[in-house]
Amino acid sequence: MSNTHRARLERRIAGSTNRWRFPKQPFTGDLLSLSQMFKALSIDFEEALRNPDRLYISQIQKFFCENFKNKDIQSAEADVILECLGFKWELHQPQLFQSETLAKLYLKALMQGTTYPLRELEELLRAQSPKKTKEKSPAKRMIISLKINDPLVTKVAFATALKNLYVSEVEINLEDVLGVLASAHILQFSGLFQRCVDVMITRLMPSTIKNFYEAGCKYKEEQLTTACEKWLEMNLVPLVGMQIHLRKIPQDLLHKVLKSPRLFTFSEFRLLKTMLLWVFLQLNYKIQAIPTHETVMTFFKSFPENCCFLDRDIGQSLRPLFLCLRLHGITKGKDLEVLRYINFFPESWLNRVTANHYHALENGGDMDQLKDLNTQAVRFGLLFNQENTTYSKMIAVYGFFFKITGLRHDTTSYSFYMQRIKHTDMESPFVVYEHKPVSLRAARLVKYEIRAQALVDGKWQEFRTNQIMQKFGLTKPSCKSHILKIQTVGIPIYVSFAFIFPPS
């Protein structure tokens, strides 16, 4: 007897009990090992065939995946025909068991098609065992059917999903990833489903955020929906808000993002402009290019003045979104004029904003009505890009001037801080004039937090100071805030400065 033949027939022990199997082709036509396999898994196979939904398919999957993962099946005859999407797909039993859906369909078909299902399975497995070609008899092909109603599943995407049963690293194209995800969900092919999620998370952009988020909601994939929310928190204002894709952002996703304390914006007024543009695009669906800010303002101004936009039937459903905005953080005179000009907000909202501003100005900037830094702070932001080595911006609130600054020390080291500036030290007198009034107060109590976020390998890194209470003077060192120092390879870096002026 040849060594090859001897090796094929020799059994070896498997596990700590008296279970034996052929070492070369485990569980393929080896009826003793097949029987022992199910005994080891405590599976009543006859009962499992009567109730396939109760069977822990993953237990059998593990055996098939380990033993047939890289097996060359190109020359092997298919033993399962899957009828789906108007096509007949030829499959092989070991690969089929990677899909829980197909495995259950197979077992149901096995139960319905024969009086002795276990014997039928044994014959199918025996047909796979290595024999001389002339000794092989063709195995009976099992036919199973799968009906798919998900519109995301295309024939190309489904073919890609089935190909992944055989080859683990099949490339998933961006244009097909939604269909492959849907196919993996229907097939209950968990490994492929996770691969699709990973691809989608790394390919979030203005053109994909809407479809990827809705897919995450549809298939209850929290990892994907959370990734979409975090991505939009950073990119709503600086990126999506500059493109026509803003129109597609779902209202529920927008609401979540607006409530998030991590939301990045250059200023409260810039966030308002983004939201007004979103509403404009919802109502003017034929427009395919981003309009100017003046066009948007003129549109809202065109409604009759007897009723503001949010009090109209068309605006009632949008109130929750605009209640998330921090209108009290809009302090520049010309921006406040815009609030009234567009006739968008109820008069009571505008009166409250005006009253709070007057109170703060009369009391040296004190923001008595603001308590919670996470939900009420005035926010300003810097977007630190690859080309920046030093980047700063001047901001002013109630006559107090601050410079928010970012510095790059080397390829991965950065620091960020804010510093109070005398109005007489401003580089341009126009800045003082634009932000009037001017406070002559020597010290200003500020409660603030500096936060920096960057995307690295599909995951967000977040760096932040504590919530700090500090009196800002006009000379060093009291004029300078705590410095946030970070190490990251992520670019760009989204830096937020949030603060309130407590009573002092």
UniProtKB/Swiss-Prot annotation:
Ranges annotated as spanning the membrane: none
Cysteine disulfide partners in this protein: none
Sequence ranges assigned to domain BTB in this UniProt record: 148-204
Any one Pfam family match given in the protein's UniProt record, by short name: BTB_BTBDG
InterPro entries attached to this UniProt entry: BTB_BTBDG (IPR056426), BTBD16 (IPR042833), BTBD16_C (IPR048859), SKP1/BTB/POZ_sf (IPR011333)
PANTHER family: BTB/POZ DOMAIN-CONTAINING PROTEIN 16 (PTHR46843), BTB_POZ DOMAIN-CONTAINING PROTEIN 16 (PTHR46843:SF1)
Stated name of the protein: BTB/POZ domain-containing protein 16
Organism of provenance: Macaca fascicularis (Crab-eating macaque)
Name of encoding gene: BTBD16
